Amino acid sequence: MLNQMKTYPRSAYAKVGGIVYFARMLDKIRLHSAHRLPADYHQNLGKAFDGRCSRFLRVDYSALCERVLQGGTDEEILEWCFVTGRRPNEEEILVWNSFMRKRGWRDEEDGTTKELENYKAQSGLSHRQDLLTLFDYYEVDEGRKE
């Protein structure tokens, strides 16, 4: 269910350096450190999409957390990722963004579609046939979209 009193990370659609999800991951790290991240987000810290994003940039998630907590802008932290890990090219970013924005849609082979359906059911959103991806689900569940 929607809870406007919770503090949520930014939209997964938000981009830093043209890369979706990165801003959300940084927000989750910061909110967790400040004890403001909702408890149901804790189990996936450094896993799931966080893990995918850190692997895409080839940085260790725990090292990234340390860097985020040292301070700096999202852009500075992304540049640290590029230096520490790798700097994806324009085509790799396009593939990443397209892949991430569509997670949950027709992803039966790895269980992501079922996971999305479970999240929707837990949030009372099973009736929402327009929520085809996890990104779309986050938008509604976190109150950015109706």
What do the predicted segments below correspond to?
Residues 2-41, 99-146:
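Polar/charged low-complexity regulatory segments
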Residues 19-22, 61, 74-75, 93:
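Alpha-helix initiation and N-capping motif
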Residues 38-82:
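Amphipathic alpha-helical packing elements
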Residues 57-61, 89, 104, 124:
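Short alpha-helix boundary/capping elements
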Residues 52, 94-96, 115-116:
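Aromatic-residue detector
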Residues 74-87, 94-98:
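Charged interaction scaffolds used for protein-protein
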